[in-house]
Amino acid sequence: MKILVPCKRVPNPDLKLKVANGSVDLAGTTWQVNPFDEYAVEAALRLTEKGKGGERVGEVVVVSIGPKDTSAQLKQLLAMGANRAILVAGDDSALDSDLVARILRAVVAAEKPDLVITGKQAVDGDDNQVGQILAASLGWPQATFLASILLAADGKSATVTREVDAGVEERRVRLPAIMTVDLRIIGKKAVRNEALAPATAEWEDTQRLASLKGIMAAKKKELREITVESLGVTGGILVKTLRHEAPPARKAGVKVASVEELVAKLHNEAKVI
């Protein structure tokens, strides 16, 4: 089985970005793999190995669109255990969800994966669109916001669960398909391939970290750089971001000494009661 995992580099979400003159100042920003895409890589690795730390059966290919230094994030994913990496070189600030999906559709056509798994959304834009657009353009089934994946022994379908407002929804999806994953996908028993791992198989309750052995092995793995033009993708973006603005400053909270004082402030100042 071949699994393709599209991944995006994002600014470190723990750092405060500077917003000025309608744009975000990314000078000096540190970049990392979008956390939800890391979860997708972990899910793909579990689906292609014989239990925790077991032999890999199949191939996990990661792909990212961005400038040349995005190779640093791809090398991290190779060190995690991915077999190959593809960098579609280009300006990742000049993309929208539709163009990303068109580029990925061309990559899918070239790679012919059995399954595409990606994060439910990127933490910088929070658009939650690429997986759905890609599935629609390919005419493939899609399963989004997944909390678990159980791949059938014949590799032709998967039973998946997703958390919804009313509880947990279970579906069966035929392959090839597009899947987007949520945080719970890295649970101990959230992902399993019936053909490779027994029902008792468990993994760590988190995504794996790159080991020294993995880092050394990554140096010998293929990281291929291609261009958007070589994929035959034409046309520009459909959605343009006009400006970014920082949230307006809020007044500091106040402490009250009693319930009576709180009620008085809610009535006289906030005027909500």
Positions of PLM-derived features:
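N-terminal glycine-rich FAD/FM-binding segment characteristic of electron-transfer flavoproteins
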Residues: M1-I273
